[in-house]
Amino acid sequence: MAVLLGVCNWVHPLLQSPSCCKELKEAGIDAIQLDLGSAEEDFPLSSPGIQRQWKEEAELYGIRLDAVAVLAVLKHGMTAEPGSERRNTAEKAIAAAVDCAADMGIPRIVLPSFKASAIRNKDDLRETARCLRLACALAKHRGIAVATENLLDVTMMKSLLNIVAYDNLCSCLDLSHFVLRGREDVFEALPEHLAVCC
């Protein structure tokens, strides 16, 4: 398995422009994860012009466009009531991310379960599973993987994967989220967590 050093483009304003690819390459960065952008701005990464710029710059400097992150679900929760404005917006963001990934040749989308999409109880888990199932159904026929990023322990993560029951669903494990919340127990089950990562 090859290891790539990557960065998320929302962590610093300078990384939000495709022109950052040159500096990333010079710094030894191999890959970048792109944010779809906000619903209020009509998901900027959906723009063909912006997509073209990212693809051209990434190809020129050998930077892998690794994933489309759907940060819009941090505000418009996947756990919101089905049919509500927030849930509808989350589902539109998911569909837009799948389209972007397919159009740009990006292999996966990432759906974070934090803030408005945090999984706090069984109802949240059920609604998250429904959104993940929608994402997987949209993504599967386009050859796109769906990564869920959350704070579930390994038993609950495996349960979520089984509930959704799509082979294009996997886990995106960011250990910093666990450490920042005092959840060092994740390290005890690290091999099991890594087994379901994409």
What positions do the PLM features span?
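A broad, structure-centric signal for solvent-exposed, well-ordered loop/edge residues
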Residues: 14, 19, 41, 72-75
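Glycine-rich, proline-tolerant flexible connector loops at the mouths of alpha/beta enzymes
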Residues: 33-58, 113-120
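Active-site acidic/histidine proton-transfer and metal-coordination neighborhood
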Residues: 18-19, 56-64, 76-171, 180
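A cross-domain feature marking catalytic cores of carbohydrate-active enzymes
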Residues: 7-11, 34-38, 67-72, 111-113, ...
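Short coil/turn linker and secondary-structure boundary residues
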Residues: 15, 46-49, 82, 184
